[in-house]
Amino acid sequence: MRIPSTSWRRIAAAASLATVTFLTSACGTGTGSNGDAAGSAAKSGDKPFIALSNGFIGNGWRQTMVAAFEDAAKQAQADGLIGKYKAINAPGDNSATEQIAQIKSLLLQKPDALLIDPSSPTALKPVIQQACNAGIKVVVFDSAIDAPCAHVIQNSFTDWATHAAKPLLEGIGGKGNVIVSRGVVGSQPEAEMHKTTQKILSDYPSVKTAATVTGMCDGATAQKAVLGVLSSVPKVDGVIGCGDGYGVAQAFTSAGKDVPAVTFETNGRALNYWKDKKIDNGSVAVMSDPGQSVAAMWAALDLLDGKKVPEHMTLPIVLVEQKDRDAWASVLKPDQYAAWPWTRDLFRQQVEAAENGGKPVQPPVPTAAD
C-alpha cells in the first residue's frame, strides 16, 4: 500500500520544524515543547492532557520520534481530540535517574496520559506505578518494561537485528571479518539486539568479529568509533550496526578504504548516499519505527475513551530494501528518519489484528516523487 509523496513531504517538513523546538528542552531547560500556549487551557475543557517523557535525545532517531509525536499531537489538538500536550527530553546519556526525576516533575502537572520511551526496562517501575496509582494511563513504547500497569508498544528488536545482520552476512558470502557496532548499551532493545546478533554470528563460523564498538545507533558516533579501530583491523568485509551505516561509510572513506557492506540508517541522507553510490553488496537499511510515539498517543486516547487496547503490541519495524529505497529517499529530508504514518484508523486496524491473532498490518510505503 502506498500514499502520495506530498503527504510524506508534509510529515518531513513538520518534523524538521519541530526539531528546533524540542532540542532546547534536550539541553536541560526542563520546559519542554508543548501545546498549552496562552489561552488553550480555557478552550480545552475536559479534553485530555498528553505528556511524553523521552529518556535520551542524543541521536536523530529519537529527535524524529519526538518530532513525529509533536506534529501528531498538534493536529489532534486542532481536531479537538486533546486539550494540550507536552514532550520532555531527559538530559544526559540515557540516565534512568534523570528520567525518573523528569517523570516525577511531569506527574505534578497531572497529565491524563503519560507516554514513555524509557531509559531502563526496570528502574522506572516505581515511578510508573506511581503514575498508574494516580489514575494516569501509561503507555511505554520502543522498549519492554517491567511495569504490569503500563501498556507496551514496541517493534520486534529480534526482527531488526536479524534483518541488519543476515542480508549483510549473506552478501559477503558468509565469510570474512566484520565489525559489530552496538547501539545504546544498557537499554533493553540493545541487549535484545546484541543477543540476536551474537546468535546469528554463531551460525556463520567463517565470519570473525574483528572488533566491537559502541555507535549508539548514531552515524557521527559510529564514524568516530569505527575509525578508531580501523588501523588495527587490516581487512573488514562488513559492519553490522543498528542504523549507523552512513557514518560507518564515512569512516572507511576517510581512512582511504573501500566501503564494505553496512547497515544503513533509514534517513534521507543515508538512503540517498546508498542510492547515489550504487552500493549493491548486501547493505540494507533497517531501524525501529520513530512513529511509535504517535501509535502510543492513539493507544492512550483509546484507553481514555474506554476502548480495549492489548497490554502488549508489536508493530512492524521499518525495513527499507533496495526495491523501496528510492521511494523513501525521494520524500525524506537528510536528517529525517523513515516513520510509518500512524493514523487512528491504522492503529485500530493493528489492535484488531492483535486481538484476532493476525499478522501486524503493514503500513504504507510512500510513492516516489515525480
Residue ranges with predicted function:
Residues R2-R10, C27-D370:
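A residue-level marker of the well-folded mature domains of exported/periplasmic proteins
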Residues F22-A26:
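C-terminal motif of bacterial Sec signal peptides marking the signal peptidase cleavage site
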Residues W8-T19:
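Sec-dependent N-terminal signal peptides
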